[in-house]
Amino acid sequence: MTDHPPIDTSSYFDCYQQHQLPLQYTFTSSSNSNTSNSSTSPSHISDQFSSSGGPPYELSSHILTPSSVIPTPSPSVASASISSPTIPAFGCTMSEYSMEQMEAISTSLFQARDGDRLVAFFKQLESLYGPNAVDHLRSEAIIVAYTYALYHSNEFETLFHLLSNRHFQQRHYNDLQDIWHHARYKESQLKRGKELNPVEKYRLRRKFPAPKTIWDGEEIVYSFKDSSRKFLKQFFRNVSEYPTQEQKREISRATGLKIVQISNWFKNRRQRDKSNNSAKCSPPSSSSSTNGGSDFLPIITPQSFNLAAAPFNMNMIYGTLRDSQSDNDQFTFNP
């Protein structure tokens, strides 16, 4: 198996320090002892993440550290042996970092969806703590990042076993469910040698639902849980059809939905109700009416008129008229 070069863990420590500044990030250059500072706004973070090559699921809100905060190891570091955890440029060892610092490192790489560096990071952990390094650390944040490293390195069986047998906190459910489903897609695509279409992905989701360890069992339809839909409907009927921004924030806290999702749901619901009410209030068209637009039902319809009885009735009338004529002839006065 090919050895992975050691990682510049001092740069990771810079990453740990910078995640506490939500509005400005400082970039540290490893080639110069002086620190050059430049800032970037959070609006540019998503652009930097888009080059990570990860699956197209949404970034969560743990630590938003741009991938550029974590520089590529210098040639001197890359040429070092993996057997020595000491970083020549800084003289630091991975074992000197606290659990909190390693959690910040792994979480930052996970948020950047930087699969290559995550794989190298966990290889270095294994060199220090052995093949069961993740179990040795007993940190859920590190294990969550480890699942993405398994996904990135195509270790599907290990990934599925880990996700199916370890219970995770609910705040990680969305990320882990996305990893589970994308791993199923990727595994199938590698076996078939072709891209999956939406129908095939849907069948895989139905065949391999997320395990209960990362799913509360509630069905999600169009990104809305059933309980969230019920909450929105009750609010719409009992509270207001036009919630304020503060009410939307309260709904967001109660349901876990985003403000934009809540706004769109209320807008669509108002439009549906308006369309339904318009359809109920509009008069029926004359073409669709069975009685020509009259408010009264016809006494005799063409379907109820018995044509077979018509000749019989006409004969009776004709016979009566003929008898009347013969009676008149009998009482004719001849002068």
Curated annotation (Swiss-Prot):
Its localization reads:
Nucleus
Enumerate the Gene Ontology biological process terms: axon guidance; egg-laying behavior; locomotion; mesodermal cell migration; neuron migration; positive regulation of locomotion; regulation of cell migration; regulation of nematode male tail tip morphogenesis
Report, from the record, the phenotype seen after gene disruption: RNAi-mediated knockdown results in 60% larval lethality. Surviving animals display uncoordinated locomotion, withered tail morphology, and defects in both CAN neuronal cell migration and axon guidance.
Q: Report whether Repeat shows up as a keyword of the record.
A: no
Q: So what family is this one in?
A: Belongs to the SIX/Sine oculis homeobox family.
Q: According to its UniProt entry, what is the function of this protein?
A: Probable transcription factor required for differentiation and migration of neuronal cells, such as RID and CAN neurons. Specifically, plays a role in the terminal differentiation of RID peptidergic neurons. Also required for CAN neuron axon guidance.
What SMART domains does the annotation carry? Answer: HOX (SM00389)
Q: Organism, per UniProt?
A: Caenorhabditis elegans
Compositionally skewed regions (Polar residues) per UniProt: 42-53
List residues annotated as DNA-binding: 225-277
What GO molecular functions are on record for this protein? DNA-binding transcription factor activity, RNA polymerase II-specific; RNA polymerase II cis-regulatory region sequence-specific DNA binding
Keywords from UniProt, A to Z, are: Developmental protein, DNA-binding, Homeobox, Nucleus, Transcription, Transcription regulation
Biased-composition ranges, Low complexity, are 28-41, 276-294
Q: Tell me what this protein is called.
A: Homeobox protein unc-39
**Residue segments, region Disordered:** 27-56, 269-294
| InterPro entries according to UniProt | HD (IPR001356), Homeobox_CS (IPR017970), Homeodomain-like_sf (IPR009057), SIX1_SD (IPR031701)
In the UniProt annotation, what is the result of changing residue 203 to Q? In e257; uncoordinated locomotion, withered tail morphology, egg-laying defects, protruding vulvae and multiple vulvae. Defective pharyngeal development, which results in animals appearing starved
Is the keyword DNA-binding in the record? yes
Query: Quick one: a GO cellular component term?
Result: transcription regulator complex
Q: Report the domain of life of the source organism.
A: Eukaryota
Pfam hit, one: Homeodomain
